[in-house]
From Swiss-Prot:
Main location: cytoplasm
Family: Belongs to the PMEI family.
Source species of the chain: Actinidia deliciosa
Disulphide bond pairs: C41-C50, C106-C146
Record's protein name: Pectinesterase inhibitor
Propeptide cleavage-removed residue intervals: 185
Gene designation per UniProt: PMEI
Signal peptide feature range: 1-32
Length: 185
């Protein structure tokens, strides 16, 4: 009988713990709300991606314009690095010399875009917002140049096309922010 009481007591205790912990683990995801985000995103070419990107980190809610600029550069740079890996994989798989050459062009464009975003971050930190704009534009152009290298067959793979558009959209967020920063042209 003591075993039965002990078992049921343990069962009730475990049930209470599970009931207590379960609602805590099912918290809805935190969405960053920042009035600056609602000012920035409608000015971009892809407002929904802008909202998704800038609201993806709860810390965005407390960031000022410069902080959101830093965050958007980081997101764009991460996207460019991921696309570089995709391009390297496509290059390794390519047997058509023309296609391989196009991938190599894209690889160079993305290496330049990553470098440009690194420079943009430094200019943001130093307060040189005009140079920030120039380097963010250069990163934007890198994705576009990759895209342009696929005029005519063989066509650009969908995965790379989408990655090019995404980098352009993310760089556009940086450009909008750079134009909103005080002292920019």
């Amino acid at each position: 009988m003591a075993f039965s009481y002990c078992s049921s007591s343990l069962f009730v205790s475990l049930l209470l713990v599970i009931l207590f912990i379960s609602p805590l683990s099912q918290r809805p995801s935190v969405k960053a709300e920042n009035h600056l985000i609602s000012e920035i995103c409608p000015k971009t070419r892809n407002p929904s991606l802008c909202l998704q990107a800038l609201e993806s980190d709860p810390r965005s809610a407390s960031k000022d314009l410069k902080g959101l600029g830093q965050f958007s550069i980081d997101i764009a740079q991460a996207s460019a690095k991921q696309t570089s890996k995709i391009i390297a994989s496509l290059t390794n798989q390519a047997t058509d010399p023309k296609l391989k050459g196009r991938y190599e062009t894209c690889s160079e464009n993305y290496a330049d875009a990553i470098d440009s975003l690194g420079q943009a971050k430094q200019f943001l930190t130093s307060g040189d917002y005009n140079s920030l704009n120039i380097y963010a534009s250069a990163a934007f152009d890198g994705a576009g140049t990759c895209e342009d290298s696929f005029e005519g067959p063989p066509n650009i793979p969908t995965q790379l096309h989408q990655a090019d558009l995404k980098l352009e959209d993310l760089c556009d967020i940086v450009l909008v922010i750079s134009n909103l920063l005080p002292g920019s042209k």
